[in-house]
């Protein structure tokens, strides 16, 4: 698996939207307490759990999930969550919240001595689970998007890209043990050099 240097993604700093991503607006966001954006948090999600390509994540982030579609949906029907981006297993990228807004992805969290990571982070959901490998195209998209985000928000560095499990230990497990951090970082570095 190799990352190619054909980055189709760039951030429009006038709108804080990702060029190259499909735009679907979530109502689940608010203003950041400051303009600082200095952390990138990697998550995983699948709805129903363990199932892919259902578009239920989109419905969930837009408060349009029908609880009668699956028993698990009844459990989460009142949650209001979002992420800035979703990278599906096919490589499709969807943006739900502009980067200058506070998406609701991290919950109770801390990083580098600071609480409330939603205040200063960008959240990226990978369609997947803790127990299945992610796809090559997901790693490619994640590396390309991370590169674009670091160029646009220079306080995000490679050392400030982390997993949800790292900022909410004991509460969250994603992106999970099968997320290959070494592969991501090595290919991210080749993307930067290439």
Residue ranges and their predicted role:
Residues 42, 124, 142:
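Conserved, mostly hydrophobic/aromatic
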Residues 2-15, 115-120, 129-194:
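Basic/polar, cationic surfaces and motifs that engage anionic cell-wall
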């Amino acid at each position: 698996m190799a990352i190619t240097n054909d980055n189709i993604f760039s951030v429009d700093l006038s709108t804080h939207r990702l060029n190259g991503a499909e735009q679907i607006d979530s109502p689940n966001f608010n203003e950041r307490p400051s303009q600082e954006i200095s952390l990138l948090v990697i998550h995983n999600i699948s709805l129903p759990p363990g199932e892919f390509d259902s578009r239920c994540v989109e419905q969930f982030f837009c408060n349009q999930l029908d609880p009668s579609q699956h028993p698990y949906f009844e459990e989460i029907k009142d949650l209001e969550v979002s992420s800035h981006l979703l990278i599906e297993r096919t490589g499709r990228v969807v943006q739900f919240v502009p980067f200058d807004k506070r998406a609701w992805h991290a919950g109770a969290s801390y990083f580098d001595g600071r609480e409330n990571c939603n205040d200063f982070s960008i959240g990226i959901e990978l369609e997947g689970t803790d127990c299945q490998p992610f796809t090559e195209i997901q790693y490619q998209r994640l590396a390309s998007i991370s590169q674009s985000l670091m160029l646009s928000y220079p306080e995000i560095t490679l050392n400030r890209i982390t997993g949800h499990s790292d900022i909410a230990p004991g509460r969250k497990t994603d992106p999970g043990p099968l997320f290959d951090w070494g592969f991501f970082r090595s290919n991210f570095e080749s993307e930067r050099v290439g």
